[in-house]
């Protein structure tokens, strides 16, 4: 087989620019605060795909690497966001027809009676063809305590599709790392089909505060400088409590602060002794009293924990 001149391949930078991969990676940086190990792994996968494409253009032999993945980590650490961006990368580089993301759980795949599971699972897979199927908390597909559980049928269908139609579907399993490892021990065929494992660490306190700032900015709000300590104190205490969900908990906090801000502004506007005027800056700024205090968090007890 003749090999084309090296110039036909172009530089990797030119390839990344032309295919839009650099833009997608930059969006990932914007979407996610911190998570450097995750971003590095995504870049490694992108690099492998880029080199594979360049080799193909030069007539060099090669095989498409396994693109099925496992994302492990706590809730709210960006797994779904990374899955969405990964789908876009795969589409940009020609490894996926559309790159769209379908998110599914056990309820979407497993039926409640005999003959119900296969149609449900196949319908979800059909919608995901050409893109990425993201199965959240995948370990719930298998119930070790019930050998007649219908989840086994869904798993068998998934395993077959992952092997026989891997060029038209990327499957990403997600969940807590310890539970995923146990899941692999029950269903060894899954682990052998996964080519890329990405671990998502919990955010640090300062990263969560930065996430809060990004969230309000995207909503066209801002946190007043003297309100940052109140925001930080709430997050720090919440991190020590059960059911903490990283960025999801921060989003809940911001939504609560927005609600308190709205009530504060509304009450001020309705005050008969006030002029009723509301400035743009007031509408955009979250102040200290808009953030629940640590004492309020503790007094609310379980209602705060189960967000």
UniProtKB/Swiss-Prot annotation:
It comes from the Eukaryota. It is found in: Plastid, Chloroplast. GO terms for cellular component: chloroplast. Gene3D superfamilies: 1.10.8.60, P-loop containing nucleotide triphosphate hydrolases. It comes from Cyanidioschyzon merolae (strain NIES-3377 / 10D). This is Ribulose bisphosphate carboxylase/oxygenase activase, chloroplastic. The gene is Rca. Keywords: ATP-binding, Chloroplast, Nucleotide-binding, Plastid, Transit peptide. Belongs to the CbxX/CfxQ family. Changing residue 137 to Q: Abolishes ATPase and activase activities. Required for the expression of ribulose 1,5-bisphosphate carboxylase/oxygenase (RuBisCo). ATPase involved in the activation of red-type RuBisCo, which tends to form inactive complexes with its substrate ribulose 1,5-bisphosphate (RuBP). Catalyzes the release of RuBP from inhibited RuBisCo in an ATP-dependent manner. Activation of RuBisCO involves the ATP-dependent carboxylation of the epsilon-amino group of lysine leading to a carbamate structure. The nuclear-encoded subunit plays a more critical role in activase function than the plastidial-encoded subunit. The keyword Ion transport does not apply. Residues 1-46 form a transit peptide.
């Amino acid at each position: 087989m003749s090999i084309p001149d090296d110039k036909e391949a172009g530089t990797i930078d030119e390839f990344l620019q032309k295919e839009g991969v650099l833009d997608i990676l930059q969006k990932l940086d914007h979407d996610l605060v911190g998570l450097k190990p995750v971003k590095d792994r995504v870049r490694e996968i992108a690099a492998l795909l880029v080199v594979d494409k360049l080799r193909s253009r030069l007539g060099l032999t090669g095989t498409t690497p396994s693109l099925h993945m496992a994302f492990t980590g706590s809730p709210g650490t960006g797994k779904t966001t990374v899955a969405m961006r990964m789908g876009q990368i795969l589409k940009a580089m020609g490894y996926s027809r559309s790159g769209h993301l379908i998110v599914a759980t056990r309820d979407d795949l497993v039926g409640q009676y005999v003959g119900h599971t296969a149609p449900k699972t196949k319908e979800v897979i059909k919608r995901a063809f050409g893109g990425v199927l993201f199965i959240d908390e995948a370990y719930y597909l298998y119930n070790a305590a019930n050998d007649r559980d219908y989840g086994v049928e869904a798993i068998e269908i998934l395993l077959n599709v992952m092997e026989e139609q891997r060029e038209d579907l990327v499957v990403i399993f997600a969940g807590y790392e310890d539970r995923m490892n146990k899941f692999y021990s029950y269903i060894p065929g899954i682990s052998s089909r996964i080519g890329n494992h990405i671990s998502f660490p919990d955010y640090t306190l300062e990263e969560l505060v930065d996430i809060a700032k990004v969230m309000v900015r995207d909503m066209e709000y801002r946190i007043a400088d003297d309100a940052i300590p109140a925001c930080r104190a709430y997050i720090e205490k919440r991190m020590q409590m059960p059911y903490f969900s990283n960025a999801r908990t921060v989003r809940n906090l911001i939504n609560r602060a927005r609600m308190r801000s709205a009530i504060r502004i509304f009450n001020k506007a309705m005050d008969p002794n006030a002029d009723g005027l509301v400035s743009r800056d007031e509408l955009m700024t979250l102040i200290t009293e808009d953030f629940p205090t640590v004492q309020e968090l503790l007094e609310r007890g379980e209602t705060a924990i189960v967000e």
